[in-house]
């Protein structure tokens, strides 16, 4: 995938990709899932304004087809933009489908990722999901994020005895989001064990 000047200007870039360089889709997806690389999300969306707009339209259409009808996406990375919105329920629906993609699930639990730049440099990217540091029992993914309007957000997944759980936390704080998520996952695990 070719990086354009449009991608290079995506704030905050995270990777500082240079216009004119090329990367594999898988490497960009990995950077996006591991360290929230917004510039990687922009490149994956196709960058040029026509294809970028087409990507956003397809993204909204797909979300609605999955049942996430209370969302309107205006960019591929989720940064605040007037008119862009979603709900915890829609986030859970989308996460459910992402969770069942083996590549996304694998990449979302990588604690770190060696990322090779087009010029040969390598940088170690660290996962923004702090649940990975002390993995609650049966925790197995997915993604954290932050925006000014949305606060600290997290979608966390777990699986116990064949039962999958997805929790979505929106508008939390960096101090609370991971502790609260861990408490919710522990509570869910306890309830599952009680009902067996």
Language-model-derived ranges and their functions:
Residues 1-89, 98-99:
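Active-site-adjacent loops and short helices of periplasmic peptidoglycan-processing enzymes
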Residues 68-72, 80-196:
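Domain-terminus/edge residues, biased toward the C-terminal soluble/receptor-binding domains
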């Amino acid at each position: 995938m070719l990086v354009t000047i449009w991608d290079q200007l995506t704030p905050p870039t995270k990777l500082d990709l240079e216009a004119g360089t090329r990367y594999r889709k898988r490497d960009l997806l990995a950077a996006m899932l591991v360290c929230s690389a917004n510039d990687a999300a922009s490149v994956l969306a196709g960058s040029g304004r026509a294809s970028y707009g087409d990507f956003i339209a397809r993204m909204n259409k797909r979300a609605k087809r999955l049942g996430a009808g209370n969302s309107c996406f205006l960019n591929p990375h989720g940064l605040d933009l007037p008119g862009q919105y979603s709900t915890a329920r829609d986030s859970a629906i989308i996460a459910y489908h992402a969770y069942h993609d083996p590549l996304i699930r694998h990449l979302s639990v990588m604690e770190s990722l060696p990322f090779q730049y087009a010029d040969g440099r390598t940088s170690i990217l660290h996962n923004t999901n702090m649940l990975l540091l002390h993995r609650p029992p049966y925790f197995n993914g997915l993604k954290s994020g932050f925006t000014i309007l949305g606060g600290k957000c997290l979608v966390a997944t777990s699986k116990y005895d064949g039962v999958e759980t997805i929790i979505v936390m929106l508008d939390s704080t960096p101090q609370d989001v991971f502790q609260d998520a861990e408490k919710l996952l522990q509570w869910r695990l306890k309830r599952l064990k009680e009902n067996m």
